[in-house]
Amino acid sequence: MRKGVLKDPEIADLFYKDDPEELFIGLHEIGHGSFGAVYFATNAHTNEVVAIKKMSYSGKQTHEKWQDILKEVKFLRQLKHPNTIEYKGCYLKEHTAWLVMEYCLGSASDLLEVHKKPLQEVEIAAITHGALHGLAYLHSHALIHRDIKAGNILLTEPGQVKLADFGSASVASPANSFVGTPYWMAPEVILAMDEGQYDGKVDVWSLGITCIELAERKPALFNMNAMSALYHIAQNDSPTLQSNEWTDSFRRFVDYCLQKIPQERPTSAELLRHDFVRRDRPLRVLIDLIQRTKDAVRELDNLQYRKMKKILFQETRNGPLNESQEDEEDSEHGTSLNREMDSLGSNHSIPSMSVSTGSQSSSVNSMQEVMDESSSELVMMHDDESTINSSSSVVHKKDHVFIRDEAGHGDPRPEPRPTQSVQSQALHYRNRERFATIKSASLVTRQIHEHEQENELREQMSGYKRMRRQHQKQLIALENKLKAEMDEHRLKLQKEVETHANNSSIELEKLAKKQVAIIEKEAKVAAADEKKFQQQILAQQKKDLTTFLESQKKQYKICKEKIKEEMNEDHSTPKKEKQERISKHKENLQHTQAEEEAHLLTQQRLYYDKNCRFFKRKIMIKRHEVEQQNIREELNKKRTQKEMEHAMLIRHDESTRELEYRQLHTLQKLRMDLIRLQHQTELENQLEYNKRRERELHRKHVMELRQQPKNLKAMEMQIKKQFQDTCKVQTKQYKALKNHQLEVTPKNEHKTILKTLKDEQTRKLAILAEQYEQSINEMMASQALRLDEAQEAECQALRLQLQQEMELLNAYQSKIKMQTEAQHERELQKLEQRVSLRRAHLEQKIEEELAALQKERSERIKNLLERQEREIETFDMESLRMGFGNLVTLDFPKEDYR
């Protein structure tokens, strides 16, 4: 999506559709920062006074600027608390976002700038208490401000404390971004990219530094270069209050906030219970402070206005001021100007990459006018005011007037007319009288000048922050890539495991079906064999029975013939008796044969039943053998599959281990490369800073050398004047002495006396001339030596300071490198432990599964054998009941009936 083209409905809902240039009127610049400017304005529909923060999202880093705007708007929309700035809406106009908020008088840093002295402890407690309520609200919703400082703590007319500037805020806690203003940054924020995450306690640290700022007018380490301050904060002890005038309660509060270890640092909710903020204080302490500040600002602005008015009057009457008039004017107002301009204030800090509404913004209301409307020049200015576009502000810089477009798009245009410059300055101070504020006009102008002059330093810090965030994005991108690679790897392994499990299941199903088919086939074969066996026995028995019957018939005939022969030989027995005996014998023989036949049939039936029973037992035993073979085959198959699965899992573990080590090496290599790049950038920035400081000092010394002839000329003129005064005195003394000598000496000696006096005067003048020349030479030599010594001392001091800062940077980088190496060692050890533990778990799992498989094998075989044994035992018991005895020792006849 092209920035500013609101195609996404969710993003479009963040912005109002009205034209802000028509909706808001009377724009007046009241603050300036890296993002642009903050304006006082009035809602044309409701007459409500608001503050407007204009943020351009064109030019360099367009996408980043647009994302910052979206983040800040989303953040502000969800805030509903008395101690956070009230959000009024956001509008878009020509690649500029107009962020509209409630109007406040100014910031806590403005109080320091106006009064030029620290706040009272009771005032610091009141401001801190209000800020803590706002922080506790943010932290309770897992939000982090990340840029707490006096410039971002605003005050309203009724004395309400408001947290502002959420351009650096985080909607996630914990966070891990390098953002904020250097001097107020917590150590864990500075080390965020290197060591991990942080939470809302970073705001507690910043609040502690803010307390030092309010108590000492500057945050800790403010005399350092901003980059050096970062290195100092990251590795040195926490700062403390320097003066002994503060109470122990305040000192403990600051020390409590500035605990180096985040886990030992209190939360904002815990700090609300601290004695420092809970103790009694006047209800109007902030209202009175604001009123005193407003009065002081009014006096400063009136002083500036009167100066402009006087210059205007003199210029109108006499033309441009001469040098002496300017000197006189400067001497008249020098004290107030020096008092206004002797401090850079919190604006010396490097603005964060994210935009700020804090020290760069303050609010305005109505105020009394103190202009003298009777003067014709002021009437002229009043008339001219209507011709000045309300969307532009006038900024006086050096010898030109720059017309700055309020939207921040226009380029400065030099106006060569000095009269117009003076009128614009006077008009600027007159317009200031229309609203109440705790920020003086000179402070607003100075912020604009500093913003332009410190662009190089600000760009360096912005570039450093961009680099840190870019490094963090690279690490996150690599971590996500490696995570995706690991997820893909694990998914691949999981699919392979699932495929193996499915294949194993399919193989077992096939084996089960095969075994069922074999059992069914064996059952059919056994049934056929049994039937065949029975038929063979029956056929044989039938054959035996036929043979037996034929044998009986033959035997019957033989016996019959034998009896007949015996009867025929016995002649003594009557024929009838013979017949009876033959019949009886035949009956006995038939009866015997019938019994033998019945016995044979009984024996055949018993033989048939017993052999069929034995055959069934053999079939059952054979079936048992098949079942045993099947279960062994199934269990062997399962064991083979399990061994293949275990080999696959070991291979997976080794491939995962190799991937994990490779990924860790890749991540650590990138981290070390980024740290080397960061350290190289830090070193380059420090060297560039050193060169800039040396150039500035050299430029200053060159200016001093250029200025020295003028100074020497002035001092020479002063000595010359003293010489002239001495000459005049000596001339007067000479005349008085001459007159006296002429009066007291005879006339004839006058010529000699005059000659003597003339020679004496000439001698003394010659001595005086020699003294004059000597004084001039000594003065020039002394001044040259003094300048050389002063410049050499400044050079030595600068070299010492830069050397200390370089040593601080080297120590910081060494510490970061050591911490990173220690972190890498911990990560490697952690990975080794994880890999070792995972391998141990895998081996334990393999052992347990093999043991479970062996146990299953033993139990199933045992259960099968027990079941088969019970089945055989039951069969044998039934055979015994049937009267077959022990079938185990039964032998089949030679004919194999099976």
UniProtKB/Swiss-Prot annotation:
Has the keyword DNA repair been applied to this entry?
A: yes
Q: What class of enzyme is it?
A: transferase
Residues with the modification Phosphoserine, per the entry, are S324, S331, S343, S346, S349, S359, S442
> Which GO annotations describe the biological process of this protein?
DNA damage response; DNA repair; mitotic G2 DNA damage checkpoint signaling; positive regulation of stress-activated MAPK cascade; regulation of cytoskeleton organization
Is the keyword Nucleotide-binding assigned to this protein?
yes
InterPro entries for this protein:
Kinase-like_dom_sf, Prot_kinase_dom, Protein_kinase_ATP_BS, Ser/Thr_kinase_AS, TAO_STE20_kinase
Q: Where in the cell is it found?
A: Cytoplasm; Cell membrane; Membrane raft; Lipid droplet
Coiled-coil residues: 452-502, 548-649, 754-879
Q: Which UniProt keywords apply?
A: Acetylation, ATP-binding, Cell membrane, Coiled coil, Cytoplasm, DNA damage, DNA repair, Kinase, Lipid droplet, Membrane, Nucleotide-binding, Phosphoprotein, Serine/threonine-protein kinase, Transferase
Active site, renumbered: D147 (proton acceptor)
Q: Specify the Protein kinase domain's residue ranges.
A: 24-277
Q: Which GO terms describe its cellular component?
A: cytoplasm
Q: Which SMART domains match?
A: S_TKc
Which reaction(s) are listed as its catalytic activity?
Answer: L-seryl-[protein] + ATP = O-phospho-L-seryl-[protein] + ADP + H(+); L-threonyl-[protein] + ATP = O-phospho-L-threonyl-[protein] + ADP + H(+)
In residue numbers, the region (Disordered) covers 316-362, 405-425, 565-596
For the modification Phosphothreonine, the affected residues are T357
Protein function: Serine/threonine-protein kinase that acts as a regulator of the p38/MAPK14 stress-activated MAPK cascade and of the MAPK8/JNK cascade. In response to DNA damage, involved in the G2/M transition DNA damage checkpoint by activating the p38/MAPK14 stress-activated MAPK cascade, probably by mediating phosphorylation of upstream MAP2K3 and MAP2K6 kinases. Inhibits basal activity of the MAPK8/JNK cascade and diminishes its activation in response to epidermal growth factor (EGF).
Descriptive protein name: Serine/threonine-protein kinase TAO3
Provenance organism? Pongo abelii (Sumatran orangutan)
